Amino acid sequence: MNYQPTPEDRFTFGLWTVGWQGRDPFGDATRQALDPAESVRRLSELGAYGVTFHDDDLIPFGSSDTERESHIKRFRQALDATGMKVPMATTNLFTHPVFKDGAFTANDRDVRRYALRKTIRNIDLAVELGASVYVAWGGREGAESGAAKDVRDALDRMKEAFDLLGEYVTEQGYDLKFAIEPKPNEPRGDILLPTVGHALAFIERLERPELYGVNPEVGHEQMAGLNFPHGIAQALWAGKLFHIDLNGQSGIKYDQDLRFGAGDLRAAFWLVDLLERAGYAGPRHFDFKPPRTEDFDGVWASAAGCMRNYLILKDRAAAFRADPQVQEALAAARLDELARPTAEDGLAALLADRSAYDTFDVDAAAARGMAFEHLDQLAMDHLLGAR
């Protein structure tokens, strides 16, 4: 099997991923800064489809207008030379100290207004570069103490911000949608909209909910102890999976941002199986950090590993679904019954059906095995390469 990625696989990387210098709360950078144009070229050589960026990844904070245009020009030239795309962009509303108490929900009203203007400016650039999705990660939107933030007011301000952004892109005629990225904590002690479920509920309160979806990240949901494929399934069910961030995470701890497949391998297998069966058409976007132990050779090896692992899992998942024994096991586990409506004949017929309650043999039903273990072992065999 050929696991060499091509642009048709639609693999994308954030500039901040391969460009991460290895700086963390306990140590300084272990790598030099990487030119965005160089990232574009190297990722293209590896078979990627495109790149994404925060405004400050591409244009250093505080750049003059002349410097800004110079950075954009060099980036465009790299895109044109390689054919790489920019399907998504986002705003850095977390690094500069001005955002120490958040951006859209900062208690300081002036900071909130600045955050909106900063975002709008980058939306214009994102659209110019061809982006169709704009991600919003509220990493500083939260609190460490109960009295510091009235969460109801903060949610009002967050709603106001997204409604204003929706109004702006509508007035401009932009073909752009927003994807909210949940995370439970880090860097704030507790972050607003911590999970996919919180974000989906919030979206329903917005003035233009059709413009908003979610951008779930593997590690973020797993930091909350949740099942990531289940969260993705609910986002797909709601028609709100506008983007996805793929990486690796090993349990409930800090945000590890491992390369995809390097954390919970079973969850990664079921995730790829779900995305491919659902016909998800968006980019497979990697939001990871090459470990600070690595030099630049290790950076590119890590990026290549993300794509290779996805393709291996895609191959294994397809083989699992095509296996005749798996088809038999799925039938034995009654998956076809789950897909059938419980009361397709309506409420009246359900209430009139004595076999549904009065004569239903609960003991016989309780004694029926579900054959889930056999089915799961077949999946393990395929995942581990034993079938």
From Swiss-Prot:
Q: What is its EC number?
A: 5.3.1.5
One of the entry's Gene Ontology molecular-function terms is: xylose isomerase activity
Active-site residues (renumbered): H54, D57
Q: Which UniProt keywords apply?
A: Carbohydrate metabolism, Cytoplasm, Isomerase, Magnesium, Metal-binding, Xylose metabolism
Q: Where in the cell is it found?
A: Cytoplasm
Cofactor entry = Mg(2+)
Query: Main localisation, per the record?
Result: cytoplasm
Catalytic activity annotation: alpha-D-xylose = alpha-D-xylulofuranose
Bound cofactor: record note: Binds 2 magnesium ions per subunit.
Q: Into which EC class is this enzyme placed?
A: isomerase
In the record, the note on similarity to other proteins reads: Belongs to the xylose isomerase family.
Q: Subunit arrangement?
A: Homotetramer.
**Which protein are we looking at?**
Xylose isomerase
Q: Which lineage?
A: Bacteria, Bacillati, Actinomycetota, Actinomycetes, Kitasatosporales
**Primary gene name:** xylA
